[in-house]
Amino acid sequence: MSECGGRGGGGGNNSEDAEDEGGGPKGSGSLSPAGAAASLEGRIRRGLRGASLMARQRPELLCGAVALGCALLFALKFTCSRAKDVIIPAKPPVSFFSSRSPVLDLFQGQLDYADHVRQDSEVVVLFFYAPWCGQSIAARAEIEQAASRLSDQVLFVAINCWWNQGKCRKQKHFFYFPVIHLYHRSFGPIEYKGPMSAVYIEKFVRRAMKPLLYIPSQSALLDFLSSYEPGVLGYFEFSGSPQPPGYLTFFTSALHSLKKDYLGTVRFGVITDKHLARLVSLVHSGSVYLHRHFNTSLVFPREVMNFTAENIYKWASENQETLFRWLQPHGGKSLLLNNELKKGPALFLFIPFDPLAERHPLLDEITEVALEYNNCHGDQVVERLLQHLRRVEAPVLQSLAPELPASLPDTQLMAASPCCNTVVLPQGPALSRTHNVCELCVNQTVGGTRPSSVSVPQCSFFEMAAALDSFYLKEQTFYHVVSGSIECSNFLTSYSPFSYYTACCRTISRGMASFTGSEQNVLTAPAIEFSSLEKSCEATAPSSIPHIEENRYRFPQVGLTSTAFTGLSCRTNKTLNIYLLDSNLFWLYAERLGAPSSAPVKEFATIVDVKEESHYILDPKQALMKFTLESFIQNFSVLYSPLKRHLTGSDSAQFPTQHLITEVTTDTFWEVTLRKQDVLLLYYTQWCGFCPSLNHIFIQLARLLPEDTFTVARIDVSQNDLPWEFMVDRLPTVLFFPCNRKDLSVKYPGDLPITLPNLLRFILHHSDAASAPQDPGISPPTQDCVQSKAVLQREHISHVENAMQKLRSEMSSLRRTQEQVEGRLLSARRDGHRLLRRQRTLEQQHRLLRRHSQKLQALYLKKARELQELARASGTPLPEHTWLKILVATMERELEGQGGAKEPAPLGKARPNHSKSMGTTQLPGDTPPPSTTSSTLASETKHENRTD
């Protein structure tokens, strides 16, 4: 039995396996869902049985699998829990300033603590920084230097405004770093936007500490008024009250001005002495005065505006008058220079400036130049301020109040110190043994330089040149064949109606040594021979008169008294706007404008004229001073300026010297083009797409032609400026400079392709045959050959002149023909316009007639249809006509029956009803009533219907 049981058991297991594998009973060919579930359970059961068997046999594998699963679950849980922290947390901030620094460093952004300490100090400077900002790091040393100098008066606080957990980062939203805010007690913040330099920061802080400048004396008043900055003066009496009414408002207005303009363009001063106040027309305490150099100075209108700090600053800023402006580019993208250059020609002065210095001699000279340049009416107040700037002693002032412009000077007020020059009239054939020598003097008016300040009676170059021009126009008046006396004549200048010239002339022979008319005190008596006199006169001719700058250096004291410069801004169409820049900070701009990079003194002056697309520089070898500035401005202001346009170019050292094609720059242009060779110059730029395709052509050309007689060169005109006469309007352009005829340069035809054969033909056609090397075996030409060649040349010249004359006549005839054709074209154009207007009128009338014709056609069709209907109606008998005939016949019968015997009542009753019904009027469009027969038939039909 055990075997059966065993076999049976075995058979049972096999049957289960068979069912699991087959998915159903033996012999079944398809799988059912119940069989699939049983199969899955069988697999799981067998897997668990195998795992338990393996665990019993090798328990260490089970423990390892369990440990590995736990580790995977732990790692997955840890990763998912840290999924939000994808940014590394910021490191805690550290101190930005050292512990020994005078700056209080709140590196954790404690803005509330900064507000707390600000309440205990009168002046506080807050420095907001970001630790990673390079500009903040660079400004750190400057802030420390300024704080060390002002630590006993000002509290400097640095705040880290970048740490994300600090209050500064949460409450302040700055777009740049560093940021400097200044608080003066409860007033602020005043933001500083100037250069991050210690001296400028200290100057700004000191300006905020003392916004008002005390004026105790007349000298201090002149210092205040002669400054280039606009000045506002307030008069307050402190005798009756320690704080007069309006003083605090005036004090706040000075701080308000500094808040609006960190440069402190408008200065504020206080006068407490009533005598000083009267000099500027201030009488009542609390009045405010705005000084202006050239326009009428103003007093604050209390009756029009409220006396508030903002109104005072607004009034001063709207009415201020500036001599020149300080420019401080911040180094980034800015329209500062562009906006100023749009206003007109600009004079840029780069000077080393120390804001903390008490005196600025060079700045005083520039101020003096600006005052004279704009002093158009010779104002006495401006003259007094100029004397103060020159440190010239002057009498005590009576008043600095503005006065009305003086009337034009009379002839008696002409200056008593004319300037003279000796000239010689051109001699003619009849006067070969005599010469007319004249002393030409320019009489100056009071509107120019005062005689008291004139040290040398010498005119400027321009005045003497104008006098010579007017003199030579009237030289026939001064010719005398033989005259022993001195004759003088006065004539007005054509340039100014308020000045005139005096010419005193005398005829002398060649042997005369000197003039004898010393009693006139006009002519000098030089003891020289006429030959030397003639040489000296030739030296003083207009073409040989030294340049104005040379003249000023020859007579330096004359520059102080020149009348040509005073009020020049009102006598020229090229008025300059003057701008100053600190060369210690912005020397890079000066280098880009033409200043040398290795200048021993960083002083530079340049004039930029955007409209004329040119700029001029003052010679760096000349010192920047009043004389040179006046000469520089005068030379620019004349109509035909002697200044040379500054040209910028590439560095010639970067190009190799030994090359087939010579690279030309601005500095080497004249050297290359003026060689004793034929020079072919190509104009190109880097952005010209067609220019590089010509390189192989010019390389082949340079290889074909000999180097000793021909030069192939090129110039990049985008990097190198050239004089106007050598500029071109298209690229590429080829210019040819012949060897011995450099003034006859030729441009390659623009409509001719630039190819090697065309270039060779062009060069051979325009080259100089004389420049080619001659064969030593050929003998020189004979005299007859030279004479015949000269005759041929003269004939050729006469032929060319005749051809030119014919061309001129043809041009004149063509011009007349052109004028006639233009007149005819104009009349034809007028006729065309007139015909066009007539055509438009006719077209409009035609459209009106067409619309009228269409209306008539529609009306015609309508009437035609009506006529057809009438004709149709007249041809067809209408039912109304028949009904009328019956009615007439009936009435006739009734009339006939009235005279006969009476009929029975029913018949008589029926007739009136019938007649009544018959008497009803029917319109032509109505339906005729039915006849009697039809009525009877209708009644019978109804009766039959009712019966049925």
Swiss-Prot record:
How is it placed in the membrane, per its record? Single-pass membrane protein
Task: Report the principal subcellular site.
Answer: endoplasmic reticulum
Q: Which residues form a coiled coil?
A: 793-874
Top-level taxon of the source organism? Eukaryota
Point to the regions of Polar residues compositional bias. 915-924
Chain segments annotated as transmembrane = 61-81
Output the InterPro entries linked to this UniProt entry.
Answer: Thioredoxin-like_sf (IPR036249), Thioredoxin_dom-contain_11 (IPR052792), Thioredoxin_domain (IPR013766)
Q: Which pairs are disulfide-linked?
A: C438-C441, C688-C691
UniProt KW keywords: Coiled coil, Disulfide bond, Endoplasmic reticulum, Membrane, Phosphoprotein, Redox-active center, Repeat, Transmembrane, Transmembrane helix
Locate the Phosphoserine modifications and list their residues. Answer: S798
Which parts of this chain are annotated as the region Disordered?
1-35, 895-948
What residue stretches are annotated with the Thioredoxin domain?
A: 88-214, 618-768
Q: Where in the cell is it found?
A: Endoplasmic reticulum membrane
Q: Name one GO cellular component term.
A: endoplasmic reticulum membrane
Q: Pfam families under this entry?
A: Thioredoxin
Q: Gly residues bias located where?
A: 1-13
Write out the similarity annotation. Belongs to the protein disulfide isomerase family.
Quaternary structure and interacting proteins, as annotated: Interacts with the cytoplasmic part of DUOX1 and DUOX2. Interacts with TPO and CYBA.
Q: Which PANTHER family does the record match to this protein?
A: THIOREDOXIN DOMAIN-CONTAINING PROTEIN 11
- What is this protein's function per UniProt? May act as a redox regulator involved in DUOX proteins folding. The interaction with DUOX1 and DUOX2 suggest that it belongs to a multiprotein complex constituting the thyroid H(2)O(2) generating system. It is however not sufficient to assist DUOX1 and DUOX2 in H(2)O(2) generation.
> Mind telling me what this protein is named?
Thioredoxin domain-containing protein 11
Q: Which organism is it from?
A: Mus musculus
